[in-house]
Regions:
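Structural signature of tandem alpha-helical TPR/SEL1-like repeats
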Residues: 468-476, 499-512, 533-546, 567-580, ...
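Structural marker of alpha-solenoid helical repeat scaffolds
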Residues: 481-482, 516, 550-551, 584, ...
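Primarily the internal scaffold of c-type cytochrome electron-transfer domains
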Residues: 39-45, 52, 59, 67-144, ...
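N-terminal Sec-pathway targeting helices
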Residues: 7-21
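Helix-start (N-cap) detector for alpha-helical repeat units in TPR-like alpha-solenoids
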Residues: 486-488, 521-522, 555-556, 589-590, ...
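Terminal, low-structured helical/coil segments at or just beyond the last alpha-helical repeat
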Residues: 737, 745-772
Length: 772
């Protein structure tokens, strides 16, 4: 046998595979499987709770309560949400206004220009130059600035995007990553806030406001996290006192008695203890940042809570077992949760109003004196038996300021009133840590002690406890028993099945959700993804077409529909729909990525490259777009830059088999064979059923003298794709290298009989040269 000649043949075949590596448009095949719908759901609005008929412009309150309104406007709640204004900015946008986030490789700069405020993001590109530059205008500010100010940008589709850098008041003010963003895979400029966020940071939006070019009711828009063009600015009087229209009308009527005027508004001071506490707890009781920490009743829309109504009719609070394990964890929304642990609270009738006047919050030394006096109203006779440090007060030891565990750049007062403070530095810097979903196990009902005896409450408990033992079965039983009209609980089951990878059940429960409300966009998206995952492409496409018919400007549905058309080879339709998606939202990364795929398929490489780069400008850590750009550059022979983008794809998604595969092919062409073997081995590990990866790895192993390992990989190819002629040829050559001619003959003869003419010719040549 002429071993050198066989080796030469093997080497040439390896280069042939690398040089002709075709672009694999990963997004077109995998996107539906990777999209995750939100785990938090919006409610449907029952007819009797139309907010616009009950609420008034908060300015109406000022007419009679001018002094109270003036002091309230200075409180944190009164300044909780506002339009951004360069004139009123407390931050320094000129000095120390950059954040280099090493974990994600992003650089952010805060800019003031022409009376407007912006956050600018950039990265260092392949050549060391600035790339992926995106600038978003700051349209709204969340937070009073007492502790922090976070920023929102209104996207073209009406969503409010939380920006990644926040200003923190500690240490005279500085910039750092927003809560939840100090992570490698942070959300950058594409995290749309949910209505639940707005619930506690602002007044209720007016349901008469049309949020989507006048075409949608508020509640259908909130399903998609789209907010009205006009929003309240700050938590107003009606969040604590209830809807004010009846009160204003009574006060404006000269015939109204004082009793009638008082009866038309809620005065929290006159409520019983629990109802009074609940007015504050609607926003200041969070048991844990781990989810689920609360569950709203399916028959209550997000903005339907009214002061004085039992909170349990609106939502229930839960405590994850994982949170119980860390009993002294302190979070930013923990005030009521920590207060309820205190002996002072448990052994008295104290409420939040015992210490706080929500209309007038003191600061500095005045605040200290005020709160110490509140303590002394019950503890004036206490005599300390130990020497106290100079200048210490009740608050110093019993309610110290602490750094919050979930928002690590904020220091707040711990409302857990206890005899001695923890023996550690409560202000020490903390690193942000975010728990994974798998870290959350069972949850138990925290508040109230017993839920209301209603189907809505029973279902809410079951929905929150889906991950408890037999939780899914319990929820499904209740849904079958009560048949609620709202779609959210059904979608909750569908999304839990998605976590398990049970796509047929995902489709079943998504359909049930849509039976309850046919325009429920999260269920449309969920159903479509499940149908594509189960190879029901035609039905999945129809589902998306029906969704687009209902929401013609929905860039998510349009992008998914374009993807569906591309999968089925309908490139003209795909391109048209994706252009609509880009028009609706120019910053949807996947739309640009898919348009790049279409341009690449048409041979328009310059357009393809432009779209792939635009996709990455919108979302730099998009693994698919990085991989697609890497493939395009690979084909053009721009190897070093191609390697840069393949590495970016793998960094974004280390389990992305095709990126490892493509990078391995490139490395083989670049003659970096050990690295190529490592990448292809990783690709095989992540995608063991892909015969092409096994074949490429086998070719590479054989070319580098690892015939035994190569034979194993060729054997795996033939298990996955029997009689595959190229694998038969490769295995035959490998067996010749191992001096196993009889076994080699079998595979070379099979290759010679295959339908691929070039493979057959080479197999016949080897048979003639070595075995005949």
């Amino acid at each position: 046998m002429k071993t050198r000649q066989a080796n030469s043949f093997r080497r040439s075949r390896l280069l042939w595979i690398g040089a002709l590596a075709a672009i694999v448009i990963a997004a077109a095949g995998a996107f539906f499987l990777e999209r995750k719908a939100s785990r938090t759901f919006r409610g449907v609005v029952p007819a009797p709770t139309a907010q616009s008929s009950d609420y008034v412009d908060p300015a109406e309150c000022t007419r009679c309560h001018r002094d109270v309104a003036a002091t309230y406007r200075k409180t944190g709640m009164g300044r909780s949400f506002s339009k951004a204004s360069a004139a009123s900015a407390v931050e320094d946008f000129a000095r120390a206004n950059t954040v280099d986030h090493r974990l994600s490789g992003m650089r952010y700069e805060m800019i003031k220009r022409n009376g407007e405020l912006f956050e600018r993001r950039s990265q260092r590109g392949f050549d060391g130059k600035e790339t992926n530059v995106m600038e978003e205008r700051i349209d709204y500010v969340i937070g009073s600035g007492n502790h922090a100010r976070t920023y929102l940008h209104r996207a073209a589709n009406g969503q409010l995007i939380e920006l990644p850098v926040t200003w923190y008041a500690e240490s005279k003010g500085y910039w750092a990553m927003s809560p939840g963003y100090d992570q490698k895979h942070q959300k950058d400029f594409f995290r749309a806030i949910k209505p639940e966020c707005m619930f506690c940071h602002n007044g209720y939006p007016n349901s008469d406001t049309k949020p989507d070019a006048g075409s949608l009711h508020l509640d259908a828009a909130l399903d998609r996290s789209i907010f009205p063009a006009q929003l309240p600015e700050g938590i107003d009087c009606q969040r604590c006192h209830g809807p004010g229209r009846a009160h204003v009308e009574a006060a404006s009527d000269s015939h109204s008695s004082a009793e009638r005027v008082r009866a038309t508004i809620v005065n929290p001071a006159r409520l019983g203890r629990e109802r009074q506490l609940e007015v504050c707890m609607q926003c200041h009781l969070e048991t844990s940042y781990l989810e689920p920490n609360e569950q709203r009743a399916f028959d209550r829309p997000i903005f339907s809570y009214r002061p004085g109504q039992p909170m349990a009719d609106y939502k229930l609070y839960f405590l994850p077992d994982a949170a119980n394990a860390t009993d002294d964890r302190f979070e930013i929304a923990h005030a009521a949760f920590r207060l309820r642990k205190s002996a002072c609270f448990r052994n008295s009738q104290m409420t939040c109003l015992t210490c706080h006047d929500p209309h007038d919050i003191p600061h500095g030394p005045e605040a200290t004196a005020h709160y110490v006096e509140a303590c002394l109203s019950c503890h004036r006779g206490v005599k300390h038996t130990v020497a106290l440090p100079a200048a210490s007060t009740c608050l110093t030891c019993h309610m110290p300021k602490r750094r919050t565990d979930d928002t690590v750049h904020v220091v707040m007062t711990d409302h857990f009133i206890r005899r001695t403070e923890p023996a550690r530095d409560l202000l020490a810097p903390l690193a942000e840590a975010v728990a994974l979903k798998r870290d959350v196990t069972n949850v138990t009902l925290y508040y109230p002690e017993k839920p209301p005896a209603t189907p809505a409450a029973e279902i809410a408990v079951a929905e929150a406890q889906m991950n408890n033992d037999h939780g899914m079965e319990r929820l499904q039983t209740l849904l079958e028993r009560y048949q609620p009209d709202a779609p959210e609980p059904y979608l909750a089951v569908a999304q839990e099945y998605e976590q398990e990878g049970n796509e047929p059940e995902v489709a079943k429960w998504s359909r049930l959700a849509l039976e309850k409300r046919g325009n429920f966009e999260p269920a449309i998206v969920q159903l479509a993804h499940a149908l594509f995952a189960t190879h029901q492409d035609a039905e999945g496409t129809r589902t998306l077409e029906e969704g687009v018919a209902q929401y013609p400007q929905d860039d998510l549905l349009l992008s998914d529909l374009g993807n569906a058309y591309l999968r089925s080879g309908e490139t003209a339709q795909a391109a048209a729909v994706l252009e609509r998606a880009v028009k609706a939202n120019p910053e949807r990364s996947e739309s640009h990525n898919l348009l790049g795929a279409i341009a690449r398929g048409r041979g328009n490489l310059s357009t393809a490259e432009r779209e792939f780069r635009e996709s990455l400008r919108c979302q730099p850590n998009d693994a698919d777009a990085n991989d697609n750009l890497g493939n395009l550059l690979f084909e053009r022979g721009v190897y070093n830059e191609a390697a840069f983008y393949f590495e970016k794809a793998i960094d974004a998604d280390p389990m992305f088999a095709q990126a490892h595969h493509h990078f391995g092919r490139l490395l083989a062409v670049m003659d970096q064979l050990p690295r190529a073997v490592a990448e292809l081995t990783e690709a095989v590990r992540e995608s063991p059923e892909d015969f092409q990866i096994h074949e490429d790895l086998a070719d590479l192993l054989a070319a580098t003298g690892h015939e035994g390992e190569a034979a194993v990989q060729y054997g795996r190819v033939l298990e996955l794709k029997p009689n595959h002629p190229q694998a038969q040829l490769g295995l035959g050559i490998t067996l010749l290298e191992q001096h196993r001619p009889d076994e080699a003959r079998q595979h070379l003869e099979a290759a010679a009989q295959g339908l691929d003419a070039e493979t057959a010719r080479r197999a016949n040549a080897l048979l003639a040269q070595h075995l005949r």
